[in-house]
Amino acid sequence: MTKDIIDIVNSFKHHQLQYGLGGDPEQEELYKWKLVTDQIGHPDVNAVDFAKEINSLSLKNLCYSTQTTAIRHFAEYEPEEYRKTFVGLFDENIGLQERIDKFISDCRELWDGKIKHNFTQKTSAMCDERLISFFLTLKDPTKYTFYKDEVYGSLCNLLGEKKKSAGQKLVHFYELLNNHVIPAVESDTELIDSINKEIDAKGYVHSTPLIAQTALWNYARYVRNNDKTQIWLFLGGKDADDYHFEEMYS
């Protein structure tokens, strides 16, 4: 692990010890643990009513509002075909990159072939790595966490890594997280103990990848607030509804 990563984790620890995950009004992160805990294991591919299963999901600001609309249209028009795409996505016997590629391809094909004609305006499947990371995190938060392009980009910059092209970023992000950030988090027992005490009091799920992602998001916010030349495509907190779709294709 690099000194920069250790410094980021240490900085996040100091913030955690001062505010906790839910005590800073400018950076409230506890909601992510609640959201995962409330919805872990969903969408359930064995649910009798898969449309209802999809419609019950709460994505909050972890995905784009248009993606919430899109997945509900999938559920409305082709729930059984949509179910099949998740069966493949959640098959851990298949490599993650292959699952991502197929999920994106199948969703686009399903949308273009059977759903798009229901709308007069131009639409798309709105299926990208950010949405996929949401589904994977709910499936297994001990292995996966949420993806944001700016967090991935800042991590690549720190490690001197070249960013992958769209469609290959999520796997690369998880690799960097597992190789560099998670070990730094796991070695900081003071940080782990503080977070575990807070989430245990609420009965929330444990997730080291989510801690690592939150530490990186803490750093990304710092960079955003201190580098006026940096253009951020998603603004969290009070600006959580300010979306820019170039992030999805960069």
Predicted regions and their residues:
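An N-terminal alpha-helical hairpin/helix-loop-helix interaction module that forms a charged
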Residues: M1-A125, D140-I231
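Short hydrophobic alpha-helical segments that form membrane-spanning helices or hydrophobic packing faces
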Residues: L131-T137
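Short, solvent-exposed loop/turn segments at secondary-structure junctions
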Residues: T137-K143, D239-D241
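Compositionally biased, charged N-terminal/linker segments
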Residues: Y222-S250
